[in-house]
């Protein structure tokens, strides 16, 4: 049985009354229900409210997603209490839409899977509280999901990928390099020592005031940087990738942010404009910081591949590198990683962009994987808790650093 620490976030016991009676009012169209196992996945770890039903063969029977992006763009970042309230306002509708699209009721489900770690505490609490009430009302098994494990395994829904494989998870909240040896068997090779790449790109976008740019006003920060960088010259400014002399697989993005912030301040003074106005060189700055980010990610990933092959953790041939998370949708960064994959005889695989960002499908699929393997399927949820902070797998990053693998220089012809 999966036991979680009692020091993690406490969830009040669901009320005995069947508060989700609305679920019994679904108009279920007559049809032949699949004999396959069905898992409802619920995702509320950050600022997206997602739900989906997936069967054991990987068919997505229904899904729904509510994004809070436009709300948080106006506030300059995610405000946890606001995210919590928006989850509360939308989770019932999202789950109802998902089940209606499948033409099933909760009684038809084999289990309910929900993200409980890691993430924003207030957001995680909404999803877990809602899920536990469904679990108790309909007497279904509960499958607690690790958000980053779900991202890592999403590729097995869309592609035939066998264990082991290497995964780079890059988003606004995480930057992790891990070897995936099984459904719940991960070796952590490296992680960000400070902030995540998506967070850094968002902060640079805010510093450049890209929300005021006509091409970028409705985009997230990272997407705005990618869009603007297409018109920029990355050679116009020199921004070097961080940690170039550290022979490990860890990452750092705070330095990139500070260097870029100083550059922006300098250019504002040079152009005689106030903070908050658009620089004429904004596209060049975006291109330079994006290139430095891509090179940093590529070099650490290159070292991870070499380490895994040296230690016989990956096959010398036919090795697979999976890149997932919101930043994985950046095509420039993906191209840099493709160069590394080609140089190391690896196959680079990325989930479709809509599955790279947070969604209910990946949670439901992770539930299916766990249900099939008999891992972490709970029938007693009395002690279940959410965990805002939670590591991924077994950390062997020190062993990677001790190997001190020198990475050959690659020409990043991007």
UniProtKB/Swiss-Prot annotation:
Residues involved in a divalent metal cation binding: 147, 151, 358
Keyword terms, alphabetized: Acetylation, Acyltransferase, Metal-binding, Mitochondrion, Transferase, Transit peptide, tRNA processing
An individual GO BP term: tRNA threonylcarbamoyladenosine modification
Enzyme class: transferase
Family under the similarity heading: Belongs to the KAE1 / TsaD family.
Main location: mitochondrion
Short name of one Pfam family: TsaD
Protein name: tRNA N6-adenosine threonylcarbamoyltransferase, mitochondrial
Signal sequence residues: none
The organism of origin for this protein: Mus musculus (Mouse)
Subunit relationships: Monomer.
InterPro entries: ATPase_NBD, Gcp-like_dom, KAE1/TsaD, TsaD
């Amino acid at each position: 049985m999966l036991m979680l620490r009692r020091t993690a976030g406490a969830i009040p016991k669901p009320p005995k009354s069947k508060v989700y009676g609305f679920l019994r009012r679904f108009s279920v169209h007559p049809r032949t229900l699949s004999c396959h196992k069905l898992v409802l996945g619920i995702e509320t770890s950050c600022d997206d409210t997602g739900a989906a039903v997936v069967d054991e063969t990987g068919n997505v029977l229904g899904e729904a997603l509510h994004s809070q992006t436009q709300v948080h763009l106006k506030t300059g970042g995610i405000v946890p209490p606001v995210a919590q309230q928006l989850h509360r306002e939308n989770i019932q509708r999202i789950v109802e839409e998902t089940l209606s699209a499948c033409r099933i009721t909760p009684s038809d489900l084999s289990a309910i899977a929900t993200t409980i770690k890691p993430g924003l505490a207030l957001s995680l609490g909404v999803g877990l509280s809602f899920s536990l009430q469904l679990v108790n009302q309909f007497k279904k098994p509960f499958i607690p999901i690790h958000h980053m494990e779900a991202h890592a395994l999403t590729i097995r829904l869309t592609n035939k990928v066998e264990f082991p494989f290497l995964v780079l998870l890059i988003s606004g909240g995480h930057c992790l390099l891990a070897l995936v040896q099984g459904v719940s068997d991960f070796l952590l090779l490296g992680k960000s020592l400070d902030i995540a790449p998506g967070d850094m790109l968002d902060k640079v976008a805010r510093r450049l005031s890209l929300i005021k740019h006509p091409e970028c006003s409705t985009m997230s920060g990272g997407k705005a940087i990618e869009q603007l960088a297409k018109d920029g010259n990355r050679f116009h400014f020199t921004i070097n990738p961080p940690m170039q002399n550290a022979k490990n697989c860890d990452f750092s993005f705070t330095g990139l942010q500070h260097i870029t912030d100083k550059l922006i301040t300098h250019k504002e003074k040079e152009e005689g404009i106030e903070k908050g106005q658009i620089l004429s060189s904004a596209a060049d700055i975006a291109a330079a910081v994006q290139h430095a980010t891509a090179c940093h990610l590529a070099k650490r990933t290159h070292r991870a591949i070499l380490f895994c092959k040296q230690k016989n953790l990956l096959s010398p041939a036919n090795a697979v590198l999976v890149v997932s998370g919101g930043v994985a949708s950046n095509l420039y960064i993906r191209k840099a990683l493709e160069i590394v994959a080609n140089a190391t005889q690896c196959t680079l695989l990325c989930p479709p962009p809509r599955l790279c960002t947070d969604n209910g499908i990946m949670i439901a699929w992770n539930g299916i994987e766990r249900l099939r393997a008999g891992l972490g399927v709970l029938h007693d949820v009395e002690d279940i808790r959410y965990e805002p902070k939670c590591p991924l797998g077994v950390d062997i990053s020190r062993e990677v650093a001790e190997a001190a693998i020198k990475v050959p220089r690659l020409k990043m012809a991007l």
